[in-house]
Amino acid sequence: MSGDILQTPDAPKPQGALDNYFKITARGSTVRQEVLAGLTTFLAMVYSVIVVPGMLGKAGFPPAAVFVATCLVAGFGSLLMGLWANLPMAIGCAISLTAFTAFSLVLGQQISVPVALGAVFLMGVIFTAISVTGVRTWILRNLPMGIAHGTGIGIGLFLLLIAANGVGMVIKNPIEGLPVALGAFTSFPVMMSLLGLAVIFGLEKCRVPGGILLVIIAISIIGLIFDPAVKYHGLVAMPSLTGEDGKSLIFSLDIMGALQPTVLPSVLALVMTAVFDATGTIRAVAGQANLLDKDNQIINGGKALTSDSVSSIFSGLVGAAPAAVYIESAAGTAAGGKTGLTATVVGALFLLILFLSPLSFLIPGYATAPALMYVGLLMLSNVSKLDFNDFIDAMAGLVCAVFIVLTCNIVTGIMLGFVTLVVGRVFAREWQKLNIGTVIITAALVAFYAGGWAI
C-alpha cells in the first residue's frame, strides 16, 4: 500500500510535536478539527457498547464482562490505527460478526463460549497472516475501480437503511408484499432524526465547525428532557471483568476446541467475510476522506489492514466479538478528520467510558441517526466517480452498490459486482481488460458462496 504523503518545500511547517507526528497541517487539518472528528465518530459508534453485550448476552456471555471487553477492543484497535497507521478510522467489535458469533456459532451450532472465542482468535491470526503477507493488499490492488466506487455507494445506502430502521422510520412490512414499509412517521425518534438531518444540512452548508457533533449533543439533551426512555443512570461505575458467576472472559478461549473439524468451516467463514467486508469499508472511508494517493491506493493502507486484523486477535483474548473498522468512521471524516489523531481520540474515549458506562445510555439512537444518514448521503456522491465510458465497469459497480443494501451484506454485493464484471467483460469481448487477480478473486468469492460458507 502507499506510504504517507510527503512534505514538499512549499508545504506548511508542522506546528509542534503533535502536528509533526500526525502530519495534521500537512493533511490540511487542525488539532481542533481532529478532536471534533474523533468525538463525532465516538458518538456515532458508542451504541456498540450496548448492542454487542446485548447480542452476546443472549448466547450466554456475561453482558457486564462483554461491555468491558468491547470497550477494550475499541480502545486498543482505534489507538493502534491512530498511533501506528495514522488514519482517521476507528475500530470496534463488528456488529455483523458479533451476530454470527452469537447466533450461528454459539446458539446455532451449540459451541461453547470458550470455543467460540478460540474461533475468533484463530480468525484474527489467519486474518493477520493474510494482511502481513500482502494477500489483502493484493486484493485491494485488484479491486476494479467501478466496484471500489460501488462499494462506497452501497455502504452509503446501507448506512441510510441502518439509521432509518434504527429509529423506526423504515420497518419490516407487517403484511405480505414488499419487504419494508414506512414506520411511525410522527413518532418522536423519527421526527428528531429528520429534524437533526435537516439541521446538519444547514450547518454544513454554512461550514459551522463541529456541526454534526453539535446536532448529536443537542438531540441527546432534548431526549433527556422529553423522552422517558432516556434516563440519567449516574456518572461513574467501576468496570467489571467477571460475570455473575465470578468467571472472567479474559484468556478463557479454547483454541484446540476451535480447531475441531466441525468448527473450522465457521472460522474460514469469519475470515472470508472479514477480509472483504473490512477491506471494502477501509477503502470507502479512505476515499471519502481523500486519503488516496495518485494511484488510488490508501495512504498507509498496509498498516491500516494489519491494525484491523490484529484487533481481532485481541478480541479473542479479552472475550469479545471479532473487530473491524467501523463504517461510522465516515461520520468523523465528514466532520473533517484526516489523521490518526481522530482515531486516537476515539480510542481514548472508549477507554474512558469503561468508568463512565452510565453516560452511554444518554445518547439515544435518534441522536446519532442524523449523522449516519448524512454520511450515507455524502457517500452516494461516488456515483459521479463511475466511468460510464467503461460501461461494464460502471454497471458492475452499480450492481455491487444496489445488492449491498438489498441483501444487507457488503460481501454479497462485492461478490455479485465481481461476477457481473467478469461475465460482462467476456460477453462484451473485453476479456483483455481482465487481469488474473480479478478472475481469481471472483472464483474465490463464488466458491465461498457456492460452498454455503457465507455469513
UniProtKB/Swiss-Prot annotation:
Residues 392-427 dip into the membrane without crossing it. This is Guanine/hypoxanthine permease GhxQ. Keywords: Cell membrane, Membrane, Transmembrane, Transmembrane helix, Transport. GO terms for cellular component: membrane; plasma membrane. It is found in: Cell membrane. GO terms for molecular function: guanine transmembrane transporter activity. Residues 1-31, 85-86, 136-147, 205-208, 290-302, 337-340, 387-391, 428-455 are cytoplasmic. It is a multi-pass membrane protein. It comes from Escherichia coli (strain K12). The lineage of its organism: Bacteria, Pseudomonadati, Pseudomonadota, Gammaproteobacteria, Enterobacterales. Residues 56-65, 104-115, 169-186, 229-260, 319-320, 356-366 are periplasmic. The chain crosses the membrane at residues 32-55, 66-84, 87-103, 116-135, 148-168, 187-204, 209-228, 261-289, 303-318, 321-336, 341-355, 367-386. High-affinity transporter for guanine and hypoxanthine. Belongs to the nucleobase:cation symporter-2 (NCS2) (TC 2.A.40) family. Azg-like subfamily. Its main location: membrane. GO terms for biological process: guanine import across plasma membrane; hypoxanthine transport. It comes from the Bacteria.
